[in-house]
Regions:
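Short beta-strand elements bearing conserved aromatic residues within extracellular beta-rich modules
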Residues: 298-300
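Disordered, acidic Ser/Thr/Pro-rich linker "stalks" and the adjacent N-terminal cap
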Residues: 190-259, 267-294, 306, 316-320, ...
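Extended hydrophobic-aromatic, low-complexity segments
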Residues: 137-140, 273-274, 346
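Generic short beta-strand segments
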Residues: 264-269, 339
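Flavin (FAD/FMN)-binding glycine-rich loop and adjacent Rossmann-like elements that form
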Residues: 1-200
């Protein structure tokens, strides 16, 4: 609400006190200063910390701009993405009487954020993540959203681990960007226009079949490299209901391999709007509990020449992404038998990986 004429960092307490004065003053007027019908209302909660939309931004090897966002730039070294509007707030907050609080420039689609915006151009061992990354002021108007900050932080954490692996500084990781991107995807991250090409994933070289499927939900979708709905492309395998004995998805490997892990990505219905709010009215509109689309119970069966050589049971799952540790066993076939979902009438699986 405030901060244009003050130092957002050094004058933090002063800004906070001014905001308290505005908030309680407006509430006093609503409750006591006119015919607003609020005489019997009580103020339930006021935040204690001013929310900083921006303060310091550090310069990296690339400065993300408004043009990059509006033109949906797809960088070769993308490690994060965003899609929020370019959201410009009135500089003087409540004191800008003639302006709307927010001037939001909407656009369709998403943009990517390059790795080069996450490390300092002149401090050789410094990464940034969150609202201090290398963007212009208008670039930050979109990238400042918490979800965007979060996935950038995950990318930086993974990048730091690779710097340790290769004994390099952040700028020196450029030759290993593909490895970083694949690390992000393996942990169920998403990067536009980047598919799973993990050389270690044996599923990519397998043939896939299922006990049933529907049009658009073919078994081969689980190894197409994309683990969520993108535009009109649905991308999962979807069973035609659930038979009494369950539904099976079978991956026939390109030979006999020792398999110790199978990763599965299910449908948690990303299209369902979840609003984190203190509003009781909004909370009452939210779906309570586990997403019904998620698979609940299933078995991962290792087979060699058609004979079972290992089985791992998973019960009560409530997560979208499962990394299932198996007893390392030589096999040439992986059967995953899905027994129950958390309520949905069919099974949906976006991705299967085999390691």
């Amino acid at each position: 609400l405030m901060g244009d004429g003050e130092d957002i960092i050094l004058d933090y307490e002063t800004i906070r006190d001014d905001l308290y004065a505005y908030a309680y003053g407006i509430w006093d007027h609503i409750k006591n200063g006119g015919d607003h019908g609020a005489e019997n209302y009580a103020l339930q909660w006021v935040g204690a910390l001013p929310g900083m939309r921006e303060s310091r931004r550090l310069m990296g090897d690339y400065v993300l701009t408004e043009s990059d966002i509006l033109e949906h730039r797809m960088f070769d070294d993308a490690v994060a993405y965003g899609g929020w509007c370019v959201d410009l707030h009135a500089a003087h907050g409540l004191l800008d009487f003639d302006l709307l609080p927010s001037d939001c420039h909407h656009f369709l689609g998403v943009y990517t954020i390059p790795y080069r915006s996450y490390y300092s151009k002149n401090i050789k061992n410094l990464y940034m993540a969150g609202r201090d990354i290398s963007t212009s002021k208008l670039g930050l108007a979109s990238t400042r959203i918490i979800g965007c900050c979060a996935i950038g932080g995950e990318a930086v954490g993974k990048a730091a681990s690779l710097c340790r692996k290769y004994g390099c500084e952040p700028r020196g990781l450029a030759p290993h960007i593909r490895e970083l991107q694949q690390m992000i995807l393996r942990d169920d991250g998403y990067l536009p226009n980047v598919k799973n090409t993990d050389d270690a994933d044996m599923a990519l070289r397998a043939s896939v079949s299922a006990t049933s499927s529907i049009a658009g939900g073919e078994p081969a979708n689980v190894i197409n490299g994309v683990s969520r709905k993108i535009g009109e492309d649905q991308n999962p395998w979807r069973s035609d209901g659930i038979a009494d004995g369950g539904e099976a998805l079978t991956l026939t490997l390109d030979g006999t391999h020792v398999v110790s892990e199978v990763d599965l990505t299910f449908d948690s219905n990303f299209a369902y709007p979840i609003r984190v709010t203190m509003s009781a009215n909004r909370q009452a509109q939210q779906r309570i509990g586990v997403a019904p689309e998620l698979v609940r119970d299933y078995d991962v069966i290792q087979k060699l020449d058609g004979k079972e050589v290992g089985r791992t049971e998973v019960r009560g799952n409530y997560q979208r992404h499962n990394a299932v540790a198996l007893n390392p066993t030589g096999c040439n076939e992986i059967e995953i038998r899905f027994i129950a979902t958390n309520g949905a009438p069919s099974v949906k699986v976006y991705e299967v990986r085999v390691y």
